[in-house]
């Protein structure tokens, strides 16, 4: 279906800065308390955010996980291999300055939300089966929990119907209620799944990361089952989606 191409992903703060690797410059990683927060240390020095701010984390669990990401770097530091560090940096560096724009970027996905598209059952029966299995319960949860009724499109349609203003208002309220940490997680999950419905369901514990992955990839999974896996393409995409959604889920839970 062509709706996947209708919206490009806005660049994250890390992407705008660039994500070039650099040599590892430290030997030891650890964590310590910083008042009511936790911080990661590299050779006993506090780790700052990319913008130079203090990386003050709300839980020991998150600090340990980010320290583990830094400890796992071998000869070179690869930012792409540290999704939790990226989320924390986004929450601290980007969102306080660009909160309204971040919310706007997330809400824009309502118009082309993955869960709103319906395949023609006669032409794509397996895609349609998976859409009904995964998307309908998420939309029902969104309607019941947040009062946002994202109407599904006609079977085979390339565009979803206009988003009801009441639904957009409800989604706006849901985003506004989130902390900066949770908004960072929602942004990542929404951009990866191309669905604010899936993102909110993941943060709301209606689905887990595995369920979010299945809902986000109904077309890809059906096509792989029919035509087979293309190594170096499908497997790479699956790994990326899996890591990003699992990281968003963990990050949201560790900052609750």
Predicted regions span which residues?
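Internal, conserved structured core segments that host functional sites
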Residues: 100-170
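Long hydrophobic alpha-helical segments typical of transmembrane helices together
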Residues: 213-256
């Amino acid at each position: 279906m062509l709706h996947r191409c209708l919206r490009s992903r806005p660049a994250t703060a890390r992407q705008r800065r660039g994500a070039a690797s650099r040599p590892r410059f430290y030997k030891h990683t650890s964590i310590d308390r910083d008042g009511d927060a936790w911080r990661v240390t590299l050779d006993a020095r506090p780790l700052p955010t990319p913008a130079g701010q203090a990386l003050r984390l709300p839980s020991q669990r998150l600090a340990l996980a980010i320290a583990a990401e830094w400890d796992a770097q071998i000869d070179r530091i690869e930012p792409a291999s540290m999704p939790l560090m990226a989320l924390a940096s986004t929450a601290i560096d980007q969102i306080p300055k660009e909160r309204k724009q971040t919310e706007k970027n997330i809400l824009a996905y309502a118009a082309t939300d993955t869960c709103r598209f319906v395949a023609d059952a006669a032409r794509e029966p397996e895609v349609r089966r998976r859409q009904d299995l995964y998307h309908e319960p998420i939309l029902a949860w969104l309607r019941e929990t947040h009062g946002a009724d994202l109407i599904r499109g006609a079977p085979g349609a390339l565009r979803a119907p206009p988003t009801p203003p009441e639904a957009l208002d409800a989604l706006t309220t849901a985003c506004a209620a989130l902390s900066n940490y949770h908004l960072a997680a929602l942004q990542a999950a929404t951009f990866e799944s191309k669905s604010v419905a899936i993102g909110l369901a993941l943060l709301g514990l209606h689905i887990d990361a595995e369920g979010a992955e299945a809902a986000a990839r109904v077309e890809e999974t059906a096509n792989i089952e029919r035509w087979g896996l293309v190594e170096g393409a499908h497997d790479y995409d699956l790994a990326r989606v899996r890591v990003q959604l699992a990281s968003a889920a963990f990050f949201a839970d560790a900052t609750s």
